[in-house]
């Protein structure tokens, strides 16, 4: 058993492990809810004693026209979703939106490009300028743009990129049911390139894709056995978009999201566990349970790429109800 002890603020220890077995993860997911929440709470109170929640804002810089065939995604050219593709935002407009997000309380700005991989040339040079500009605002900068080369990863690191997002989406076993134009191994190799360049990883998955509990356990096992653990672990609930192969799938039971968050918190004590897409269908009560279970970041703003998100004022009220600390309350 590989253990690394992390001494928290009150001098108690949290153990970091990178050798979780499938049966251990599956057992956690299946624990009685009260016991699972208790275990997650004990970890979360040690590693985040002030109950701070990071607010991350997400902007789609390049929307639509993606060559990948992800079954859940409205931006794929293989799907018939009714979205409008448009040219990339200019650098100045992106930085203007980043400043607006910061003024609203966000301290992380994430930028997305609907690409299979990063293209060299002017689009990439603009991306680097955006990263530098976001960092100059005093914000964390995250990019999601598909696969990349070693040199591109190094240049993003030199520009000051905080994290690169590249989700695994689902388990290795279920992956071919969701996407066929990129292999699971290619996703892993992309994450390795990012880490080798000195950029932290933002990687997680989606529940509600028709996967089994075993698939969820397998996904979490892959994430939890990365060493070090990802800096951020986004947990998404499927937003079934018309025109995609998964358009008729039902919404998840919100308690399933609570279980995923709690298990991720136990497995990866120091990672940010981010409530991502699908929050609107959870309701306030389930989201507050997710904060209790260990979620310490949300995507904040009215839109996530091409799907809706709770309004800023609604999120302010939610976070106030939950009694957590956020960026604006820390500086008031």
UniProtKB/Swiss-Prot annotation:
Protein's pathway: Cofactor biosynthesis; biotin biosynthesis; biotin from 7,8-diaminononanoate: step 2/2
Binding of [4Fe-4S] cluster, residues: 66, 70, 73
Top-level class of the enzyme under EC nomenclature: transferase
Gene3D superfamilies named in the record: Aldolase class I
GO biological process: biotin biosynthetic process
Names of required cofactors: [4Fe-4S] cluster; [2Fe-2S] cluster
Domain Radical SAM core: 51-279
Keywords: 2Fe-2S, 4Fe-4S, Biotin biosynthesis, Iron, Iron-sulfur, Metal-binding, S-adenosyl-L-methionine, Transferase
Record's catalysed reaction(s): (4R,5S)-dethiobiotin + (sulfur carrier)-SH + 2 reduced [2Fe-2S]-[ferredoxin] + 2 S-adenosyl-L-methionine = (sulfur carrier)-H + biotin + 2 5'-deoxyadenosine + 2 L-methionine + 2 oxidized [2Fe-2S]-[ferredoxin]
Family of the protein in this entry: Belongs to the radical SAM superfamily. Biotin synthase family.
Subunit structure: Homodimer.
Protein name: Biotin synthase
Organism of this sequence: Prochlorococcus marinus (strain MIT 9211)
């Amino acid at each position: 058993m590989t253990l690394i002890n992390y001494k928290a603020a009150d001098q108690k220890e949290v153990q970091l492990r990178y050798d979780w077995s499938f049966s251990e993860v599956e057992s956690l997911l299946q624990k009685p809810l009260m016991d699972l929440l208790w275990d997650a709470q004990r970890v979360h109170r040690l590693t985040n004693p002030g109950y701070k929640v990071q607010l991350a804002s997400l902007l789609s810089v390049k929307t639509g026209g993606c060559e990948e065939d992800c079954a859940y995604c409205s931006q794929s050219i293989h799907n018939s979703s009714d979205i409008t593709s448009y040219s990339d935002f200019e650098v100045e407009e992106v930085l203007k939106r980043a400043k607006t997000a910061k003024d609203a309380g966000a301290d992380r700005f994430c930028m997305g490009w609907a690409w299979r991989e990063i293209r060299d040339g002017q689009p990439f040079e603009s991306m680097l300028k955006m990263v530098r500009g976001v960092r100059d605002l005093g914000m964390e900068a995250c990019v999601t743009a598909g696969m990349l080369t070693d040199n591109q990863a190094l240049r993003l690191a030199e520009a000051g990129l905080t994290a690169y997002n590249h989700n695994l989406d689902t388990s290795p076993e279920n992956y071919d049911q969701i996407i066929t134009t990129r292999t699971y191994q290619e996703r892993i190799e992309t994450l390795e390139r990012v880490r080798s360049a000195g950029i932290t990883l933002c990687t997680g998955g989606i529940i509600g894709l028709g996967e089994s509990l075993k698939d969820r356990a397998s996904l979490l096992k892959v994430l939890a056995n990365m060493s070090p653990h990802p800096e951020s672990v986004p947990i998404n609930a499927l937003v079934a978009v018309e025109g995609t192969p998964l358009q008729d799938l039902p919404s998840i039971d919100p308690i399933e999201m609570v279980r995923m968050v709690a298990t991720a918190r136990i497995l990866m004590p120091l990672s940010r566990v981010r409530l991502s897409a699908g929050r609107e269908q959870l309701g306030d009560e389930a989201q507050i349970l997710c904060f209790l279970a260990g979620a310490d970041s949300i995507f904040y703003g009215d839109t996530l790429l091409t799907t809706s998100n709770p309004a800023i004022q609604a999120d302010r009220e939610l976070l106030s109800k939950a009694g957590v600390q956020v960026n604006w309350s820390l500086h008031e």
